[in-house]
């Protein structure tokens, strides 16, 4: 008489991990194909299986952000931050959405946390500068924007903001210095600032 042997079934947690693995591959394929809504649905399925899946949380957060569903995006990013508190990007994502929502103090806290982890995160310095401007803390904002320009010297964004801040501080000469610097590598942005500020590049310093 033959004896039938039965292999033990895989533990449920192993099955869940395997299913999440294949679902991630499927979601990434949908993203590559530009099928964001289908990828969104797959990431939701992943969270039902594994609520602490950071990739799914961040992906859903970015999807909501792209659709301008800011509160929903913040919810996903905050959940991801709880799971990855030592990652600068996790703090930055929360700060970015808070800044978009006009929640300046929360955004400032998140950007500063990101910088504390990664002092060279240029976009966190830029975000910090923006929220400090919103709070009319102009001197501090200039420090943040200056650090951004040290990390990204050829990016015009912080230079642009610095010129605007100098104008807010009634310092047109300093604004003009920034505009002249910008004119050397981003003449279109410099021209925009000339129109906005009414300053003349030919004006003597």
Predicted feature descriptions by range:
Residues 20, 54-55, 88-89, 122-123, ...:
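Helix-start (N-cap) detector for alpha-helical repeat units in TPR-like alpha-solenoids
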Residues 29, 63, 97, 131, ...:
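TPR/TPR-like alpha-solenoid repeats
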Residues 160-170, 189-205:
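TPR/TPR-like alpha-solenoid helical repeat scaffolds
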């Amino acid at each position: 008489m033959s004896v039938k042997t039965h292999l033990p079934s895989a533990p449920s947690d192993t099955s869940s991990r395997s299913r999440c693995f294949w679902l991630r591959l499927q979601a990434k394929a949908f993203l590559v194909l530009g099928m964001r809504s289908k990828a969104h649905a797959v990431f939701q399925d992943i969270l039902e299986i594994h609520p602490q899946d950071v990739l799914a949380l961040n992906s859903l957060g970015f999807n909501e952000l792209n659709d301008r569903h800011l509160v929903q995006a913040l919810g996903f990013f905050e959940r991801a931050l709880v799971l990855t508190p030592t990652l600068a990007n996790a703090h930055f994502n929360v700060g970015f959405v808070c800044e978009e929502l006009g929640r300046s103090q929360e955004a400032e806290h998140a950007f500063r946390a990101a910088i504390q982890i990664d002092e060279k995160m240029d976009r966190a310095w830029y975000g910090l500068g923006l929220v400090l401007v919103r709070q009319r803390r102009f001197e501090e904002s200039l420090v943040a924007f200056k650090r951004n320009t040290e990390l990204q010297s050829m990016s015009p964004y912080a230079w642009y903001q610095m010129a605007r801040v100098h104008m807010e501080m009634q310092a047109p000469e300093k604004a003009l210095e920034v505009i002249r610097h910008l004119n050397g590598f981003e003449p279109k942005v410099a021209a925009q600032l000339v129109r906005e500020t009414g300053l003349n590049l030919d004006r003597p310093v």
